[in-house]
Amino acid sequence: MAGAVPGAIMDEDYYGSAAEWGDEADGGQQEDDSGEGEDDAEVQQECLHKFSTRDYIMEPSIFNTLKRYFQAGGSPENVIQLLSENYTAVAQTVNLLAEWLIQTGVEPVQVQETVENHLKSLLIKHFDPRKADSIFTEEGETPAWLEQMIAHTTWRDLFYKLAEAHPDCLMLNFTVKLISDAGYQGEITSVSTACQQLEVFSRVLRTSLATILDGGEENLEKNLPEFAKMVCHGEHTYLFAQAMMSVLAQEEQGGSAVRRIAQEVQRFAQEKGHDASQITLALGTAASYPRACQALGAMLSKGALNPADITVLFKMFTSMDPPPVELIRVPAFLDLFMQSLFKPGARINQDHKHKYIHILAYAASVVETWKKNKRVSINKDELKSTSKAVETVHNLCCNENKGASELVAELSTLYQCIRFPVVAMGVLKWVDWTVSEPRYFQLQTDHTPVHLALLDEISTCHQLLHPQVLQLLVKLFETEHSQLDVMEQLELKKTLLDRMVHLLSRGYVLPVVSYIRKCLEKLDTDISLIRYFVTEVLDVIAPPYTSDFVQLFLPILENDSIAGTIKTEGEHDPVTEFIAHCKSNFIMVN
């Protein structure tokens, strides 16, 4: 445990041998020169004051202080007395206690973590950035102890926390760069000080972007927030990162994935209240079309569409030589159309409605072919049918006179229109806004409200919308529906679980099962609902199963509250059969 606390043991490796110290004394002319003219009595008093501080014999500067003291004519007896009287052996006592803990049976790793974590909390509590900077200035070079510290994860983590708390500390900024130089840039994404140094930031940006691309869609939710937070640290970091991603997005291989990440970061910035629309437009093709750029910029900045700017875009995109469709494929811009065309009660000028619909349909359906930065063809085959579908669903969704019963009569029409991805997204938003009304479920009498039935159709037709569908179902499942009695709440949650099972049957398996597994582990869900989910899933699945699915689903079945409590019909016992199949075909990993 001697290594648990920096400086805990004063050994020759750390302080140098006596012979080396003697050499230093001979070669210490520079320090002598700097002290030339100092009164010997003053030097002795200064040194004696240091010797009288607690555990000064453990300080790295002890040898230099001794040297100054003796060169000023100091007495060895005073030194020995002061150092011994003020030696309390804090570090040695820690080591002794650690040894005792290990001898009583505590794991050495656990003891080391305890000591290190306590030391970290003390350092964070008492850290003085001015003192840290002064030590650095006096050293004149990178201290050896600092290079030793950054080799260990525990102390790197300490520096990250300190750097967040003291962003102006030069010593910490230098240490972050040192950590980056040592190859640990993958750890620095959350450190704001890394964003102040271009060399460090570009290195961290490259590593983080590679991690997100390698992680794929399934890890995007985990990897993206930290990355977006780092990029959105300031205008300079946002512009630098988006400019780089804009260039990478032009690559044939992986370009679309980088563009997606850039758009997610734009959304993050917008949600945090930052208006990054001008940067978005400047990096795209909008700069070549100043009128379109001005119209788009005005609407994005205000967060709302308006007839005047929409008319400008409509004229341009109905001309013989329209701007590139990429110009209006800005996620934040398309979100504004969702609010204008699909939000219940949204008011839209009837004289301009066809313009709104045309631009949204154009962005969603037109396909362009480019060669060497020149457009060679525009395919508008699906523009008319997409416009028609958007208009039809808009009229149904925004008609406040149509209740749920009237919508049932229009289900076949809605199902036809939902086949268009842009309409499916609009319907999903409309369902979200509608069912999130506090009194919605209180007024419903059907076992499966029509709005939830529409989610099944969206799940069936559009794989890319599966995450958003599950997100909505989870939100509804976790909402307190206090206006309903207990039995009504249980029935509603069973209906929502039916939708999740349908989502699972359409291929979105692991995220759905992962969510139910979390519900079981958190113990915040009625166990009868978990049993219901298990029963419904067993009814729709059959071998062969993937290992990932078994690792997630089998522990749910083997839970004491689930196993043996699900009723079976006749001799057929799906739970036992599933467990037996898994035990004979899979090796379970705890």
From Swiss-Prot:
Keywords: Nucleus, Repressor, RNA-binding, Transcription, Transcription regulation. Changing K374M: Reduces RNA binding. One of its GO terms (biological process) is negative regulation of transcription elongation by RNA polymerase II. Widely expressed. Expressed in heart, brain, lung, placenta, liver, skeletal and cardiac muscle, adrenal, thyroid, kidney and pancreas. This is Negative elongation factor C/D. It comes from the Eukaryota. GO terms for cellular component: membrane; NELF complex; nucleoplasm; nucleus. Changing K315M: Reduces RNA binding. Residues 21-43 have a biased composition (Acidic residues). Changing R419Q: Reduces RNA binding. Changing K371M: Reduces RNA binding. Residues 16-43 are annotated as: Disordered.
